[in-house]
């Protein structure tokens, strides 16, 4: 199977005194309409100083995407001025309506802001267990997905107002056995 080549993403990350909330919504387009949609909502809970937090997450979408519920622990590192950092999460993953619903997932995220905040290199990497079939019917047990992103942060330029919080950028997808695909792909 092939996936649409155009995807739009809306995302939000918001830290607070009890941890942080992150969500995103992806919509893939075919012809002139949305062909599929997917979203994740994740919460880090932390009532202590250590860099470990409790992670809870919901993932879901339309078409071939099954609802998933995840819980685990996250280690987070940020440097003092928050120009670079990473996190690593180890989670139990329950995939609703899957013949083998009890699974695991490892997720790593990173960010690097440079050029006086004008540019950012961000992304994530997921590795999980999920019994599924590719579009050609081949059975798979493990999936890998990484999406490095490069952003131009428009509010960091002198001509933009500080409240103009808009970034434009690009994303690459490196995957193995993801969605209906069979084997390794770079999109």
Where are these regions (language model features)?
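Outer-membrane beta-barrel transmembrane domain signature
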Residues: 98-179
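Residues that define the transmembrane beta-barrel architecture of outer-membrane proteins
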Residues: 4-8, 35-39, 65-71, 100-106, ...
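Signature for the C-terminal beta-barrel architecture of outer-membrane proteins
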Residues: 3, 29-35, 47, 51-52, ...
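Short glycine/proline- and aromatic-enriched beta-strand/turn motifs that initiate or cap beta-hairpins
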Residues: 1-30
